[in-house]
Curated annotation (Swiss-Prot):
Sites where a glycan is attached: 42, 120, 168
Cytoplasmic compartment residues: 237-245, 295-317, 388-422, 474-511
Topology, Extracellular side: 22-215, 267-273, 339-366, 444-452
Name this polypeptide is given: Probable G-protein coupled receptor Mth-like 3
GO BP annotations, alphabetical order: cell surface receptor signaling pathway; determination of adult lifespan; G protein-coupled receptor signaling pathway; response to starvation
Encoding gene (name): mthl3
Record lineage: Eukaryota, Metazoa, Ecdysozoa, Arthropoda, Hexapoda
Keywords, alphabetical: Cell membrane, Disulfide bond, G-protein coupled receptor, Glycoprotein, Membrane, Phosphoprotein, Receptor, Signal, Transducer, Transmembrane, Transmembrane helix
Amino acid sequence: MRIVIGSFTAFLLLLLQNSNAEIPGCDFFDTVDISKAPRFSNGSYLYEGLLIPAHLTAEYDYKLLADDSKEKVASHVRGCACHLRPCIRFCCPQYQKMQKSKCYGDMSEDELNKHDPFVNVTLSDGSVVRRHFKEDLIVQSDLAKPGCPRMYFLNHELPGNEFTLFENGSLLRHWDKVELSKREYCVQHLSFKDDSIRIAPHFCPLSSEHSRTWKTVAIVISLICIILTISVYLYVEKLRNLHGKCFICYLASLFLGYFFLVLNVWKYSSGFCVTAGFLGYFSVIAAFFWLSVISLTLWNSFSGNSSWLNRFLPQNRFLSYNLYAWGMALLLTAITYIADQVVKNEKLRPRVGVGKNCWIYTGDMTVMIYFYGPMLLIIVFNITMFVLTAFRIMKVKKEAQNFTQQQKTTNRLNSDKQTYALFLRLFIIMGLSWSLEIISFLLSKNQAWAKAFMVADYFNWSQGTVIFLLFVLRPSTLKLLKERIKGGRDEAGASDEHISLQNTKIDPSVF
C-alpha cells in the first residue's frame, strides 16, 4: 500500500514539476530563449536591455509548433519578454533574408546599409508609431515557422497588400480583414524589385486555397480535352456547320484563357505579366461573347426566316459573328487597359499584373466592374435567349401538329430540339460554373463559405473535360467520327442526333 501511495505521490510531484516548467499566463509564442542572458541573484535576467523578473521565467524542455504540438528539445530557460515590451516575430535569424519561403545567409554590409529596419506598430490606443525592429522591439527568431512549405508575403506599397501590425504581435490583413496570431505569420527581410530591402510579413495560403499541383492537373486535363474536342469538330465535316464553327471559336477562346491561367499559377508568365494578364482577360471575355453568339443563333434558327435579326445580318453570318465576339472582347479589353493607365483612384483601377499576379486584380469589388460584371450581363442575356428559344420550340411543336407535312416537320423539329438541348446543357454547365465563380468571389472573405466553394472552383477548371464528355463522347458524334475514319461520307442520314441547324429554318408558315 505504501508503495502505491508513494508512486502516486511521485506522479503528482512530476505533474507539478512539469506544470511549473511553464510561465503562468504566458503563451509560448510570447517567450524568448534567455539561456545565454546574464542572470542576477534574485532570479531575474537581462535580455537585450530588458530586465525580465524571475516570475516571468521558466525552464522548458520543448518548443511549441504552429499547430500547438510539442517538439522535444534540450532544456533551456525562456522569459516572457513580450509581456514587458512589444515583440516582432521573425521567420529566420534576425539578419537573414528570405526568398521563396526559405532563409538565406546574413545580409552583406551593403545590404544592411540600404535595408529599411523600421516597421509601423499600432498601439492599444489606436495610434501608429514607427519602430526600429532591433532597438525598439524584442526580436523573436527561434519560434517555429508557420506550418506550410510555401508562404505568401505582403508588400504594403502595393494596393491590396496593406496590413496592420499590433503591439500585441498580431497582424491584420486588410484585404480580407483576417487577424493572424504569431502562430500564423512571421516577418523577415525581403528584397523587392525596386532594389529595396524591407521587413515583410509572410503567411500560409488560405485554408480554402487549392493545391497548385491539383489545380494544374485539373486545368491541363481541361486543355487536352479542349484540343481533342476542337480536333474532332475540325476533322468531321458534318460538325462544321454554323453552330459547330461558333462552338470551335468558343473552345479556342476558352483554351487560351485556361492556358494563361496555368501560366500564372506557375509564374511562367512573370516576364510578360501585364501582357499575359490582358491576353487572359481578352480570352475569357471572348469565350463569353461566343457563348452569347451560340444562344442567339439557336434562337434565330427557331424563329424562321421572318426573324428581324435576319434583316440586319449579311450573307456571311459567321464573319459577322466573328466581328461581334472578337470585337466586343477587344473593346472591353481596351477599356480595361485604358482604365488601368488613366484612373488615379487605386480602388477603381483594374490593376492587371499587380503583386506578381498576372491576371486582373480580384482582391476587392473593382473586379465586378471590369470582369464579373460584364460576365454576369452576358449570362443574363444567355438565359433570356434560351428561355425564348424554349417557348418558341413549344409553339412550333404545337403548330406542327396541324401542319400538312407533319412527319417531315416533326423529324426536323426533333433533330433541332436535340441540338437545342445539347447547347442548353453546355450553357447550364458553363453558366452555372461561372455563376458559382462569381458567388465564390463575393463570399471569399468568409472562410466557411470559401471552403464550401472549393468544389465549384475545381468544376470551373474542369470545363474542358465536361465539354469533351458532353460533345465528343456521345453516340452520334462517335458514330460520325467512326465513319469519317473509315472513309465514309458524312451524309445527312448518318445520324439522327447530329447538329442540324446549319441551313435549316423552321418554315415561317408554322408561326
